[in-house]
Amino acid sequence: MSQSPKVGFVSLGCPKALVDSEQIITQLRAEGYEISGTYDGADLVVVNTCGFIDEAVQESLDAIGEALTENGKVIVTGCLGAKSSASGSNLIEEVHPKVLAVTGPHAVGEVMQAVHSHLPKPHDPFVDLVPAAGIKLTPRHYAYLKISEGCNHRCTFCIIPSMRGDLVSRPVAEVMLEAENLFKSGVKELLVISQDTSAYGVDVKYRTGFWNGKPIKTRMTDLVAALGELAAQYGAWVRLHYVYPYPSVDEVIPLMADGPFKGHVLPYLDVPFQHAHPEVLKRMKRPANAEKVLERVQKWREICPDLTIRSTFIAGFPGETEEQFETLLDFIREAELDRVGCFAYSPVEGASANELDGALPDDVREERRARFMEVAEEVSAQRIQRKVGKTLKVLIDEVSAEGGIGRTAADAPEIDGVVYVEPATKASKRYKVGDFVSVKITGADGHDLWGEV
């Protein structure tokens, strides 16, 4: 029997790009290709790129160059594949003319066509043995579930719509089938992602789909309720990411707080507010009523006291005054957000914000980012200290002789804090990766927790 052709894979960028990689790898495996963990063991290499900020562009170009040097046969996909150079030609083809093919993001079909052209697929009578949940690059106990592609917003600092297009929602039955297959495969935590989770279904006017004979609207609240019901059957978690602050978010909070989905639809919201001063928000083309946002945050916490809010912000946006920046700091103190990230504004090629007046020097942007993080970390440390002495449910990610590392409902993988768990002293309390365990929290710093089973 001839040996199956082997494809190497390099995946860069955000969780949405990771899901694209998973879909491509799943299709490769379904068609009988093997996935190689090394360049020299592969017949060709696929590189999934990121093109959002300058550092990501350079990282992607470097990865392509390395793959060309080490292997020589490279197909490129992802956001950078849609990016043009200053001359108007494709940036990747201009920098690396020896690549075999270039596609944009969310292009499984195009990638597979390119693979077929340069590495014909094998005949394999056992291709149906690929698991229904697909091939995942995450650990077995958690997975990302992408519910839509693209974005209808035109934030001035962002070029995602130009690379990924307008919003296209996946059919609700398709989403639910993938979720069920993931839970059946042993996934304990499902992380719902998209460019704009709140807008799910807008493009199809919230049309009604059917799952197991039941009608479900293609709408965030209805999908979350259905996922919560499914997660409850498997004793699993559902976590929401990239939730644009639409009014519809208010409808999801009660699902987290009480009823049959409590403990399954996690009391966790990843909401990118970006700023708090109305003038800056207008220049960003973001919702500009900071006072109402603060009221909503307070209302959310009244309904769901355990709610964890993660957000991201931009400091040093063009035209931002010191007074406007101080308004942002005041908002952080008042809103008491649990997890916060901040970027010093960085011009992105193709973004309309580049045309705005009032660009700030690099040192001012970076100084404001540092000041922001100092305040945000102080707020976060105060909130996390309140967990000391409590017993929390923890999902174990790693186990070693020194103990375990896990996460609470307040901690998404990779971006939030962790819980360092002491080794179990009794056989009945031993745990393994993917287990839920009750942990008594004994200590905390500004980011992480320590505890014992």
UniProtKB/Swiss-Prot annotation:
User: Where is this protein found?
Assistant: Cytoplasm
Q: Name the gene.
A: rimO
- Please give the name of this protein: Ribosomal protein uS12 methylthiotransferase RimO
Q: What does this protein do?
A: Catalyzes the methylthiolation of an aspartic acid residue of ribosomal protein uS12.
- Write one Gene Ontology MF term: aspartic acid methylthiotransferase activity
Q: Which HAMAP family match?
A: MTTase_RimO (MF_01865)
Keyword presence, Acyltransferase: no
Which family does the record claim for this protein? Belongs to the methylthiotransferase family. RimO subfamily.
Report the source organism.
Burkholderia ambifaria (strain ATCC BAA-244 / DSM 16087 / CCUG 44356 / LMG 19182 / AMMD)
Q: Which reaction does it catalyse?
A: L-aspartate(89)-[ribosomal protein uS12]-hydrogen + (sulfur carrier)-SH + AH2 + 2 S-adenosyl-L-methionine = 3-methylsulfanyl-L-aspartate(89)-[ribosomal protein uS12]-hydrogen + (sulfur carrier)-H + 5'-deoxyadenosine + L-methionine + A + S-adenosyl-L-homocysteine + 2 H(+)
